[in-house]
Regions:
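Flexible loop/hinge segments at secondary-structure junctions
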Residues: 26-442
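Bacterial N-terminal signal peptides that target proteins for export
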Residues: 2-11
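Low-complexity, intrinsically disordered/propeptide-like segments
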Residues: 6, 18-20, 332, 343
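C-terminal segment of classical bacterial N-terminal signal peptides
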Residues: 17-27
Length: 442
């Protein structure tokens, strides 16, 4: 079968493409109305952007090429057609995804689901409740990925003359963002990098997200556990208004990681420390190219962006030590898998008010310390503002993404599969979806 003739894929800035399906490869999802027409769109976290984009294409290819999974391709059309099903995701950041979820366009074709890497705060849950969105909802983990600490230091060499890899730990990363560590040759950084010959006497250009970000949530979740000074000195709390509050906000038992832009919540502290302001960029896709183009810059991105832009990635100290010595790890499939196996997670998709715990700073000498889930929010009931076929199409895609889509064949470089038990619980939530009160996938 000629895929190019059967389905013509068009990916726009909003990651839009046409899908032609009557089921997924495993045959478990509902059959889609052959006359189904319309969009299936969501918004939110940029952490999973590369994976969602890749899934869209793979899903289309899988169902076009696998015998028996498509009854008749004649019923499906391209994304620029007036008929057919069109799947899209516009990004915008986790905060945008959450606010859109209970916004004016909720439960319509342009807002059928949202992505977030951050838990719903009590304020956000109260806003959803006050809005009365007209239905219950679920929050499921869609994909897992590590955060990479990325940097550019031109000409960094080992004492033997080879290209050097920077080592960092929670305290040094915290110090860099606080502004207590201003230069690359600071004694704290040098102590972690005895084999690096030429750490420069250059000011560190600290970069962070300018938008409300779930990636920042994962980052601050890590610092809250990994940096001994983070609880009271890193100031990562959404409600502080002064440097005093920032320095004294939370103890270890009540630490609350946030999505707030680093340039905002570190501003007073950095000024007090005589450090320059943090450079803010929107989205993982805004930070990665900036770091690539800027010598002496440092930031944090989902690891797929580090790969995509060929960025230098720091080796970060694991929680566990080997024979009393720190172990430094980079984000790989193996180190992420070790972290997920060791991490304790608290997940209850039937109760979205549950604080989902990001699997950061897991024990084990092989556990990469900055790993996070990216969650997907969807409504339990979709009204007549969308068609049954659109809801069927969304369920079919999500079921595929949580099953076949988690295999190495379909994972974009820099992402990892979620644990099987987690995916099984997520798929169970799809069976709760109704259209006008009627269960879509019994």
């Amino acid at each position: 079968m000629n895929l190019a003739k059967s389905i013509r894929v068009s990916i726009t800035a909003a990651l839009v493409l046409a899908i032609g399906i009557s089921g997924v490869a495993n045959g478990a999802a509902p059959t889609i109305d052959p006359n189904a027409v319309g969009k299936i769109e969501g918004s939110g976290a940029t952490f999973p952007w590369n994976q969602y984009k890749d899934w869209f294409t793979s899903f289309t290819d899988e169902n076009a090429d696998t015998a028996g999974t498509v009854a008749s391709l004649a019923q499906f059309h391209t994304s620029n057609s007036t008929s057919g099903l069109v799947l899209g995701y516009s990004g915008g950041g986790s905060s945008t995804g959450i606010s859109n979820f209970f916004g004016a366009n909720r439960r319509t074709a342009t807002q059928m689901f949202s992505g977030t890497d951050a838990v719903l705060t009590s304020t956000q849950r109260a806003s959803i409740a006050a809005t009365d969105i007209g239905t219950k909802y679920s929050v499921i983990p869609a994909i897992t990925g590590p955060l990479a600490i990325v940097y550019r230091i031109d000409g960094l060499k080992t004492t033997g003359g080879a290209k050097a890899t920077l080592r960092l730990d929670g305290n040094t990363i915290c110090g860099i963002y606080l502004g207590t560590i201003k230069k690359w040759n600071d004694t704290a950084i040098k102590a972690l990098n005895p084999s690096v010959a030429n750490l420069p006497n250059a000011t560190i250009n600290v970069v962070g997200r300018s938008d409300g970000s779930g990636t920042t949530f994962v980052f601050t979740s890590y610092l809250g556990k990994a940096a001994t000074t983070a609880q009271k000195n890193c100031g990562m709390h959404s409600n502080f208004t002064s440097s005093t509050e920032a320095n004294l906000n939370d103890d270890a038992g009540t630490f609350t990681p946030v999505t707030t832009a680093p340039g905002t919540y570190f501003s007073a502290i950095r000024t007090a420390n005589g450090a320059a302001a943090i450079t803010g960029k929107s989205g993982n896709g805004g930070i990665a190219p900036y770091v690539k183009a800027t010598n002496n810059a440092i930031s944090y991105v989902e690891a797929s962006y580090a790969s995509k832009y060929s960025l230098s990635t720091a080796a970060v100290a694991a929680q566990s030590k080997r024979n009393g010595a720190k172990v430094y790890l980079q984000p790989t499939t193996a180190t992420v898998a070790a972290a997920l196996k060791a991490a304790a997670t608290v997940e209850d998709p039937t109760n979205p008010s549950t604080a989902f715990v990001q699997p950061v700073y897991a024990t084990g000498v092989n556990s990469y310390p900055i790993v996070g889930y990216s969650w997907l929010m969807f409504y339990h009931d979709y009204p007549s503002t969308v068609t049954l076929g659109q809801v069927q199409g969304m369920i079919a895609f999500l079921n595929w993404a949580l099953t076949d889509g988690q295999s190495s064949m379909y994972l974009y470089k820099g992402y990892s599969p979620t644990p099987q038990s987690t995916r099984a619980a997520a798929i169970a939530e799809l069976h709760k979806i109704t259209h006008n009160g009627v269960v879509v996938w019994p």
